Amino acid sequence: MLVSWKWLSRYVDMTLSHDELVDRLSLSGLNHEGSETVDGDVVIDLEVTSNRGDCLGHIGVAREIAALTDQKLKIPTIEYQESGSAVDDSLAVTNEMPEACPRYTARVIRGVKVGDSPEWLQESLKAVGIGVVNNVVDVTNYVMMECGQPLHAFDLAKVGEGKIVVRPGKEKEQLEAIDHRNYDLNDSTCVIADSSAALAVGGVMGGASSEVTEATADIVLEAAEFVPLSVRRTARRLKLHSPSSFRFERRVDPVGIDWASRRACQLITEIAGGSVAPGVIDTAPEIPARETVLLRPKRVAALLGLEIETAELDKILRSLGCEVSAFADGLQCVPPSWRHDLTREVDLIEEVARIHGYDQIPEDSPIPVAPSSKRRFDTAMERIRGVLTAAGISEAMTPSVVTEKLDQMISPWTELPALQTRTSMLEGARTLRRSLIPSLLQSRAANWASASLVADLFEIAHVYLPAPAGSDSALLPDETYHIGLIAGEDFFALKGTIETLCDRLGIPGELTVGPVQRDGFAKGGAVELTLVGDDAKEPLRLGFLGFVDGKLVKQWKLTGRVVAAELSADVLVNQSRLVPQQQAVSSFPSIQRDLNLVLPESVRWNELAGLVRKAAKERLADLTYRETYRNEKVDGPNKKRVLFSMELQSQTETLSGGDADSIINELVASCEKQLEAVLLR
């Protein structure tokens, strides 16, 4: 925004030097981009933010200067005479597009003499980079640069049947603008038209067919409000930007529309002669009142860190055009019509800080800061990511919406059909996935095809499990976080990773496995993971682990076997103990014992480990699986030997060999009774 020093001095006394002024304006939010001298005038280039459309005119900038320097703003007094027949006798206006043009006003001036503008007007426009056209057009540009309200003048004789219609453009309709280029219009374009053709693109630029020339005698003066989004879209589509569209995109003062129209009538009649027809055509004369905003001095002190007297707050807000009145806890403020950005208490506090001076805020002011902390869920997720990454598994991110074919490959959690979106989120994808494994399988195949032969992946994301029919939430899915994993051939390595994950999360109890059959997993190659003991009153289903069906592996053109797992993040987080619990280190020596048991083939390691822990209780310091050996000739069919090590230790005394033997004997007796075990001596 270019502003002229001479022009500003018409509205406010310029008591500051150039350097002082630009520094104060910069500190208050109007950044100084540069200055230059034009014909003895100093022109200042200011950066105006998108919420300060009121500063896109000299009066708006002068108002800021007056507030900063504690002076009165001098607004021009408007006086002119109306004569002749009423405006309704010469012109009719119809607004068929109020959603794009909420308000349209028009006045008629008869008998103007179009010619060159006076020297002072030409100098004012040239100083701020506006070209000189003729006295009527120059006045409309002058008023725009004065108050920020764009205006447009039509030649009344060129307005068909004296009718102006604000309407949508028509398909294949064209308009030659005043830049003498043709533009294609459509039904999204707000058009100012007469009874037969378009005369202007609303809020952007007028048309050549109705522009004011030296032959013009009667003019129609337009002053309107156009919706910013409509103007922005039209200007972008047509690649046609103008000073008018720039201002309409940032909103104009609805009350200032009439002021700008009357100001232009005054200047035109003074410079070009003519008479203003009595009255004005206004499609929306009723302007909604601004809502009251409360300002509390205590809140000002809390946010800025300094005390400002209520009288000073009152003075600052009045200097900005607010209507201020007192109430019990502070001030009631009605923002001025030109400040669309003042809607909340914090907005008023920002204005106080700007005018009072950001430099007045003490650097060491105690600003209250609300302490923040991570959610338990976020802390757990960080730890999970750390464990899985340390295990050499890379994190993947895949879409939550997949194809129906992909979702049906593996769904261990439910057999209910997946929910569908009404429209495809991705090409051909409308299904809210019920499992992460199919997406990870697809990602592993894509990595494999790109020569990334080691593509062990995990993902933490939502799955959407359909609710059973007839339940209260049948229309909405159970949207929960799951952890999906996919790796190479080693089933036990992935199981060990899951056990490590539970250990690092401090989950008490025991991770057990049980055979299960689910579509998508190899027959006899899948287990259900369950947490039992300690905090869990009942066994909790943690998830599933198993070999992917060979048909799917072949379908994705993968080699070797693929192991996949999916865990419930909610179960992991709810059972975790994220704050480590200190355990005393025993000062007494431990005893190591190795046991070799002959067991039925059906006995799983977790059953044996459970009996060991039950027998040794708190004296079991460590339990380590060593190996499994089978010899049908010696032990018989369906038998196996399991070798494991026990470390026994007490926190209160030194265990003797007899103590250790007693524990071992109790363990062996339990195994013989419950597992049909035989101890090899």
Swiss-Prot record:
Enzyme class name: ligase
Catalyzed chemical reaction(s): tRNA(Phe) + L-phenylalanine + ATP = L-phenylalanyl-tRNA(Phe) + AMP + diphosphate + H(+)
Domain of life of the organism encoding this protein: Bacteria
GO CC terms, sorted: phenylalanine-tRNA ligase complex
Taxonomic lineage: Bacteria, Pseudomonadati, Planctomycetota, Planctomycetia, Pirellulales
Its EC number(s): 6.1.1.20
Protein family (similarity comment): Belongs to the phenylalanyl-tRNA synthetase beta subunit family. Type 1 subfamily.
Source species of the chain: Rhodopirellula baltica (strain DSM 10527 / NCIMB 13988 / SH1)
Residues annotated as domain FDX-ACB: 586-681
Name this protein carries in UniProt: Phenylalanine--tRNA ligase beta subunit
SMART domains registered for this protein in UniProt: B3_4, B5, FDX-ACB
